[in-house]
Amino acid sequence: MKEVVIVSPVRTPVGAHGGALRDKRAQDLAAIVFKAVLERTGLDPAVLDEVIIGNIGSPSEAANIARVAALMAGIPIEVPAFTVQRNCASGMQSITSAYQAIQTGDGEIYLCGGTESMSNIPYVLKGARWGYKLRHAELTDALWEGLTDPICNQIMGRTAENLAEKYNISREEQDQYAVQSHKKAFMAQRMGKFDDEIVPVEVVKKVAGQEVAREKIIHDETINAGLTVQKAALYPPVFKENGTVTPANSCPISDGAAAMIVCTAEKAQALGLKPTARIVSYAYAAVEPAYMGIGPAFAMPKALKKAGLTLDDIDLIELNEAFAAQCLAVGKEMEAQGYNWNWDKVNVNGGAIALGHPVGCTAAKLVATLTYEMQRRKARYGIDTMCVGGGQGGCLILERIPMD
């Protein structure tokens, strides 16, 4: 097997829903991180074998968004590109697709990542193309519809309620978890831990349609440093009557993009690139759609087995926080399977409840956060894992490459 490495992972700051990045389309955000990777590496984009990016929203004006963003970023016309979609693991799929292509000899070096502008997912008027003969037409919120599973007909938050019931997770436990996520993220931001992975996004401020200023967004804007358990308790459940899942203990809808080079170790050396980690193994698992949040507890064991590792070998875990209930359920399920689940290793700089979950971007974004923290701590192994809408889980195991 060829040794496959990750080079210069970067991400945009995460924008709140309708926030600072709302006027940036998913292709704009992707082009920004593509350019940043090329600038940081000094890489001639003509050497790329292909560009692969994950995206869920699939904007109609940017069909095959990987190709659109690649050309916007100045990547030569001769470099092909394609887009992958595995819901919340789309960014991870871009990396593992590149890994597979490398192992089969299709190429040696790929530009990978994920992008999402949930703020720009539209309302749609279904049936309007052929006209309406009678009565009212109804606008469909494509974002809300996209977050609803078509098999079990439950929105993602309702599937988190299912896990809270199954694993006996209380509202207070969820709120406490969420508060800790915000506290850790706030401290990490304050200490500059995200600075190396974030590339600024310039936005235009307008008044009455006229440009009045330009501003560079450099920080994630979804962190709520003032959240307490008492304040979290005031939020009502929104997915089930008398439920426990609330906006306070769920990830916020958000916007962002991430990118990196995935290539062979030999190619990195030949081009003078400095890898930050190597890919040890990866795995995807499938579960009941109504319990989709438990997916990581079945993907992690598969990836560990492939790598010949135990959970005790892992130093850091980035577990995407779609919902506090879902994360707590994953921990309980891992323990039930006999694993030594150590929360001190998990999301040490906070997670998506505080930092956002731009769905097609997140799995790639977590690679950036994980690898930089692995370098700081001189950790050997790290896991990037997430639940996946539709009833799946994804897991990527990385090994740090010293950059000293």
Locations of regions flagged by a protein language model:
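Conserved active-site "lid/cap" helical segment
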Residues: 1-61, 65-73, 80, 159-171, ...
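Condensing-enzyme catalytic core mediating Claisen C-C bond formation in acyl metabolism
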Residues: 1-24, 36, 228-294, 298, ...
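N-terminal extracellular/periplasmic Venus flytrap/periplasmic-binding protein-like
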Residues: 10-12, 22-32, 40, 173-270, ...
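Conserved catalytic cysteine-centered active-site region
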Residues: 55-110, 150-155, 226-252, 336-365, ...
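Active-site-proximal alpha-helical scaffold in enzymes
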Residues: 85-116, 164-193, 259-266, 332, ...
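Flexible glycine-/small-residue-enriched beta->alpha junction loops
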Residues: 109-162
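Active-site pocket-lining segment
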Residues: 158-161, 197, 204, 280-354
